[in-house]
Amino acid sequence: MINQTYRLVSARQFEVTYKDKVVHSDKVVVRPTHLSICAADQRYYTGSRGKEAMDKKLPMALIHEGIGKVMFDPTGTFKVGTRVVMVPNTPVEEHEVIAENYLRSSRFRSSGYDGFMQDYMFMAPDRLVELPDSINPHVAAFTELITIAVHALSRFERMAHKKRDTFGVWGDGNLGFIMTLLLKKKYPDSKVFIFGKTPYKLDHFSFVDAAYQINDIPEDVRLDHAFECVGGRGSESAIEQIIAHVHPEACVALLGVSEYPVEIETRMVLEKGITLIGSSRSGREDFARTVDFLAQYPEVVDYLETLVGGRFPVRSIEEITNAFEADLTSSWGKTVIEWEI
């Protein structure tokens, strides 16, 4: 069958390519229905990844956050019409210690390999997770982003000490919102504080115990553990503040991605015995846990609907470009594409 793939060929320029795909007996054919634009997609779209990365990875179909509908499954795993979340990480090996998202051999969609902007996806059944009909598809579109927080929390729980009375989350964006929401649900008797720089964004965090602007943090605020969800150049000052406000032997989870080297005051990390936990992306187990979590706690989905920003039905390359341009000017939430092309 002929499959159309919508690839970014240079900054702000998409083209359609046609591939003759053979339906193999071990692949499920999925029609994408709802996709969500990520900051990483925008770095490619705007060309801000730099010439070397752009030359190496383009042309490439963008987007690694999305859901779809099963159109054909020769493996018998899913019924036709089943809604599924698509897992972008594609491991080519298993390791007894290293998780699939940290294996250097793993392939990740929309990062050197074609993402979900295609007419059909041909995926192994273990790269799909069934999605209950009860979950809002516009929220489910950015399940991958939620799995990043779920994965980071699972790593934290394995490594952190048991005193978990106070948590701090730095970053008032999408990931910070999700992280604080998960912490409040996971530790209902603990206090969760959000630290950000934008007042109107902080207003969305109605469920936290306290919200602080980063230039006005009380001196006596102390935390058992913290999560950094800032990224970029701002992650350096965020980590500096975290080190100052956590108790000795705290665990600090680092989730923010920076294109630049970040300085860390290692003297105080050593003096306080702080554990830094790096966390990146996620694997199939995280997707399964996330879908189960959303199905179990529908009130969490209600909160996550706050993150749904622009909704763009897309039927042409021009409308793809319009969605990406609108996302660049959006100050809050996730842009969701209703993939009808």
From Swiss-Prot:
GO BP term, pick one: poly(ribitol phosphate) teichoic acid biosynthetic process
Pathway: Cell wall biogenesis; poly(ribitol phosphate) teichoic acid biosynthesis
UniProt keyword Cell wall biogenesis/degradation, yes or no: yes
Enzyme class: oxidoreductase
Cofactor(s) listed in the protein's UniProt record: Zn(2+)
Catalyzed reactions per annotation: D-ribitol 5-phosphate + NADP(+) = D-ribulose 5-phosphate + NADPH + H(+)
GO terms for MF: ribitol-5-phosphate 2-dehydrogenase [(NAD(P)+] activity; zinc ion binding
Pfam families in the record: ADH_N, Glu_dehyd_C
Top-rank lineage group of the source organism: Bacteria
Annotated positions binding Zn(2+): 38, 64-65, 144
Keywords assigned by UniProt, alphabetized: Cell wall biogenesis/degradation, Metal-binding, NADP, Oxidoreductase, Teichoic acid biosynthesis, Zinc
Listed transmembrane segments: none
Enzyme Commission designation: 1.1.1.405
Gene3D superfamilies membership: Medium-chain alcohol dehydrogenases, catalytic domain, NAD(P)-binding Rossmann-like Domain
Keyword check for Oxidoreductase: yes
InterPro entries: ADH-like_N (IPR013154), Glu_dehyd_C (IPR031640), GroES-like_sf (IPR011032), NAD(P)-bd_dom_sf (IPR036291), TarJ (IPR034710)
Family: Belongs to the zinc-containing alcohol dehydrogenase family.
Function field: Catalyzes the NADPH dependent reduction of D-ribulose 5-phosphate to D-ribitol 5-phosphate.
Protein name: Ribulose-5-phosphate reductase
